[in-house]
Amino acid sequence: LVYFCLIFVLAMFPYILCNLELIPRKSFKVFMGDSGSFFIGFTIVWLLIESSQAMSSLRESAILRPVTALWLIAVPLMDMVMVMARRIRKRQSPFTPDRMHLHHICQRLGLSSRQTLCVIVLLASLHMIVGVYGQRFNVSESIMFSLFWASFFCYATVITYSWKITRFVRKHQSKRKNINEHP
């Protein structure tokens, strides 16, 4: 399992280097497409299920607890649930595309693509740290699950009011811009 994870990460490394423009004097953009994204998502979920279940095909005992797996994929999981719930509430197909994902909201707030990436990576890292901490120090699964739901509630509240937050930020930015232009 460790070798598979290592190969998986190494295979994605060139993609990350190109899209973050980390190759000196070269500018490449690689579009993964739906199939690539679905494959990565499927592989990550498969790895989490495989590592969180005892008596799996690869070993006798679980590497991590199921609640830890939730923490490791918290941000994409919460984003997906919120987007699908919003679409269903609007009587749309949950698979209809829209621009209401977390990265769209961050960009509407005026963040650049790189800043948006940093915000999402920071948010995901914080959730992962909580999950790994709970696993490492053997915090009760019921406490970790309750904390996960509390985190989800906070995320849902912020996303639900994202339009108001966006309007407030833009209004505040325009006031600041007007003050700077007219001293």
Question: Where are the language model's segments positioned?
Answer:
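Alpha-helical transmembrane segments
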Residues: 1-109, 113-177, 181
